[in-house]
A protein has these predicted regions:
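Conserved beta/loop motifs at nucleotide-recognition and modification sites
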Residues: 1-224
């Protein structure tokens, strides 16, 4: 089943799936989606967590497969996270992921979360991805387009009780902000958090925003 990222919060309020697949090339949004799923799972008693990163074609999937079936009747519920940075699990991984997808159906003791980069059409039609999507919830995480970034910044400011001045000045402020972070959501996120520390809830002037983000650092997510 496919669920839009914007609808994830509503979905989690209704029900928690035993299997989630997050795929896309925006690290901040993927991390936030994973955090939301984890928080909901913890609130429902999933207290244990294990994480696996698939590095190369010779990855040993046996530990991942064993993790999902290792709980006894009286053990704590667990979250099993599988990261596949390349988006290519390989032949053994394809078989393993199909097994994981099948075992997830009706499983109320293990929540599995598979995290992938942006996938091409051929990969999405492959057997392993179809099995994951068919037995769980698939969430495609698209980047924020450059033209949408000012509005995204405004929404994030609103979440912490802040807003820019209304009218043309506010639009110039948001555009300046977007230009400074150069489309980097991680940088934008950190600058928005900085504004919450520097200024109380309420209206932000153009001068306040410019002073805060004028020297914004350039972040490379692969070096964090």
């Amino acid at each position: 089943m496919q669920v839009a990222l914007a609808q994830l919060s509503t979905h989690l309020q209704r029900a928690l799936s035993p299997l989630y697949v997050l795929h896309g090339d925006e690290p901040l949004l993927q991390q936030e989606a994973a955090d939301a799923i984890r928080a909901t799972a913890r609130a429902q008693g999933y207290t244990e967590r294990s994480s696996y990163t698939v590095a190369g074609a010779h990855f040993d999937w046996s530990a991942v497969l064993a993790a999902g079936g290792s709980l006894s009747l009286f053990a704590d519920k667990q979250i099993v996270e599988i990261r596949i940075p390349s988006g290519k699990p390989g032949k053994d991984g394809s078989v393993a992921l199909q097994q994981i997808a099948e075992s997830a159906r009706g499983n109320d003791s293990t929540l599995t979360m598979v995290m992938l980069p942006r996938l091409d059409k051929a990969t999405k039609t492959g057997a392993w991805f179809a099995a994951l999507e068919g037995n769980g919830v698939s969430i495609q995480i698209d980047p924020i387009e450059r033209g949408q970034l000012p509005q995204w910044i405004a929404q994030r400011l609103a979440q912490q009780g802040q807003r820019v001045v209304a009218g043309e000045e506010g639009q110039r402020t948001l555009q300046f902000f977007a230009d400074r972070v150069e489309g980097n959501l991680l940088a934008a996120h950190q600058e928005i958090q900085k504004l919450a520390l520097l200024h109380p809830a309420g209206e932000l002037t153009q001068a306040q925003v410019e002073a805060a983000v004028l020297n914004v650092a350039r972040y490379d997510v692969f070096k964090l």
